[in-house]
Amino acid sequence: MRGLRKYLTPFAPDQSGAVSVLYELGGLIAICDAGGCTGNVCGFDEPRWFEQKSALFSAGLRDMDAILGRDDRLVEKLVDAASKLDVKFVAIIGTPVPAVIGTDYKALGRMCEKRLNMPVITIDTDGMELYDVGEEKAWLELFRTFAEKGKPNLDIEKKRGKIGVLGLTPQDTSDLQAPKKIREYYQEKEGKEAICYCMGENVGRMVYGLDNDRTAGEVEKNIVVSPAALAAAKYLEKTFGTSYEVTYPIVEELVPDMDYRGKKILIVHQQVIGNAMRAEIRRRCQKVNGDPSVDNNAVITVASWFMMKQELSEEGDISLREEDDYMELVREEDYDIVFADPMMKRMTEDAYKMAGTGYAADAYETERKRIFIDATHFAVSGKLREEMKKREA
């Protein structure tokens, strides 16, 4: 049945994704709602809320404000809040209410800029899409507004040694330590400085607010770690000539050591991490086999509940919409190994039971044919990898 959820909780909407991108940048983030959407962001969709400050506000829309289109009241609230806080910009994030009444975000942004005397960006999310759509809009708007185009392009020597990392959010990586790990990876493996836009820079490199975004044209290459950041990477390539690579550099920690040769495998995650896990498994299969002339690779399918970019997909990759889609896929394809969020474990078990096949829940019970391996995705379960490890300990 369309839209019926018996196993999975609702996924984070687009406004949550937009907030996730902007959360650490030192701006005043106003969610244009009556209060409920902001409560969901703070309570469920943004794990940094419990340990890291951000100026995140609800517009506190009342019924008559929405019906009569009293945008001036929102402007007054923003002016008052901005005057009491040390913020560098204001971001207005859309929700279903302004979408229904047809709010003109560009006009609202101009009204605010005149009063605030600081940059104002608006993200026209409507609460009807998933988190990655909001992230994609926020990444694009961020660099369109703040990346300094007036500066002359630096020559390659001045750019050498700096790598930008696009797409890092807790929703996508499920790991609050991912920025630190990625910086260490590029420093140790390539001797280069990784600039993790929008996540982990305040603590890791003591760089605050929009400093990195303004100098986005001063890196030699961008690394794209989620499909939501691909459009921004293309924009930066067009604007500054900065090439990009789509990968997840610390993927090795997501793939446990076991024999994958000849296995039929399903990976369910966001598309870039799923692709990186597939490439890592293939690399390990080839390394174990040792003979490139012998094809002992696993047969691997990547699937996702979220955006699947055609240019990043292989033949047979799948975009999931309903729980029944997933269960039917597992029943029909009879995978040896499934990588997915733990929230999907019971659903996978039930799919195998319906098919009348055996099942092994432990990733290390390699004697059994069918194996489920935890691949935590915060956007699916609202759990971080650190949380899942603590539960297992």
Task: Annotate each PLM feature.
Residues 1-393:
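An N-terminal assembly and electron-transfer interface module characteristic of large anaerobic redox
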